[in-house]
Amino acid sequence: VIWTVSTDVGRIVVREQLEPDDEPGILELFAACDDWFEAVNGTPSGPGDVQSLFYALPEGTSFDDKRLFTVRDGDKIVGLIDVVLGFPHRTAAAVGLFLVAPSHRGRGLGAAVANVLLAEAREGGIDTVTASAHDTWPQGQTFLRALGFTVGPPAEPSGNRVSGPGEAPVRRATLTLQP
């Protein structure tokens, strides 16, 4: 599925599905977003972070539940969104990563893309969306609250993901989608 989203930075394309040719662009995005990786994980990004996109899943979900979206400005990948459908319950979706390149932050791109994907989720029968909210990345919590999420207390790690050495606790942010 491909969406074209009008934003303050121009027309952005959101694509559901990664291609093998996307890996260099994702590595470049991750390197550009080392501020986020260092704040959240305590270390810069690395090739293992790209690989974990495909393998990190909450308990009780399968690879068929995983959705990875790229956000593109022309040919350049400027964002990545990692979603697991059916978690924490059948009609929910969990956002594990919503990453926007520093060059495109603070200009409405994230909100425009999120609103398109939230509308698609609502139309697809999703009634709850959860997201990870890190105390060490307060702008992420501000973004989630602006979208209408409620940010809860720190939570324990779940699923098959191993926390990094400098990783701070994560809070679950929750948004109830109205039909």
Where are the regions that the model predicts?
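Glycine-rich phosphate-binding loop
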Residues: 108
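Terminal substrate-recognition subdomain of acyl/acetyltransferases
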Residues: 1-7, 132, 157-179
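Acetyl-CoA-dependent GNAT
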Residues: 2-103, 114-116, 120, 124, ...
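Conserved GNAT acetyl-CoA-binding A-motif
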Residues: 121-133
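Conserved active-site alpha-helix within GNAT-family acetyltransferase domains
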Residues: 111, 135-153
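Short, Lys/Arg-rich nucleic-acid/phosphate-binding segment
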Residues: 88, 155-157
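Conserved beta-strand-loop-alpha-helix junction that forms the acyl-donor binding cleft
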Residues: 105, 131-141, 159
